[in-house]
Amino acid sequence: RSTLFLLDECAQLGEFGPLRQSMTLLRGYGLQVWPFFQDLSQLQRLYPKDWQTIFNNAGVFQLFGVANHLMAKGSADLIGDVNADALRSMAKDRQIIAVANEKAQSARLPDYLVDAPFAGQFDPNPMFD
């Protein structure tokens, strides 16, 4: 039996020591950790000695909203089979999903406002009237 632990806006926690341990040791006990960072530099700044270990122990790398060449180049280097130009020119409704030991794929981003599986599963948002 496994447990999924979602850490949205993970960088807001600051340097969170248990993240390293949970991504490496505790996965053997059935804990899956999904930390969400805004960009790679947040991970590198908070974990300068361990960011690569954390990244290497992630089962999936999901990327969307590539803002500039620096972000595109760094992400392309990590993914390996997608180039920076492709990332920079990616449509706003697309994402790259890189699963460990598999070729990265482009996929459509889900949109809860219009996708049928989400209908009736959320309250109206006055920001999207």
For the regions a protein language model found, what residue spans apply to each?
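Conserved active-site motif detector
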Residues: I97
